[in-house]
Amino acid sequence: MANTTSAKKATRKIARRTAVNKARRSRVRNFVRKVEEAIASGDQAVAAAALKAAQPELMRAATKGVMHSNTASRKVSRLAQRVKSLSA
């Protein structure tokens, strides 16, 4: 339990940031799930559109510190690779 005033404030701040980060992470997961569902359905046009929407969300999460930039880049790269393989 936090005793000092500054520690109590830090606890409140952490709780707020955790809520924001959780919402952001959830939003990213939803966008990625839409891409994966489109890939599973085999519709290349829908998958490409979903990827185009998901990419900025992933990079924004990396910019905001929700995930590491390399993680976001890796996810975008792998999704793009899978979407591209649908056309082949």
Curated annotation (Swiss-Prot):
Entry annotated with the keyword Oxidoreductase: no
Gene Ontology CC terms, in alphabetical order: cytosol; small ribosomal subunit
MF (Gene Ontology): small ribosomal subunit rRNA binding; structural constituent of ribosome
Coiled coil segments of this chain: none
Family membership: Belongs to the bacterial ribosomal protein bS20 family.
Species whose genome carries this gene: Sinorhizobium medicae (strain WSM419) (Ensifer medicae)
Region (Disordered): 64-88
Keyword terms, alphabetized: Ribonucleoprotein, Ribosomal protein, RNA-binding, rRNA-binding
Record's function text: Binds directly to 16S ribosomal RNA.
GO biological process: translation
SUPFAM superfamilies per the UniProt record, alphabetical: Ribosomal protein S20
Name by which UniProt lists this protein: Small ribosomal subunit protein bS20
Gene: rpsT
HAMAP family: Ribosomal_bS20
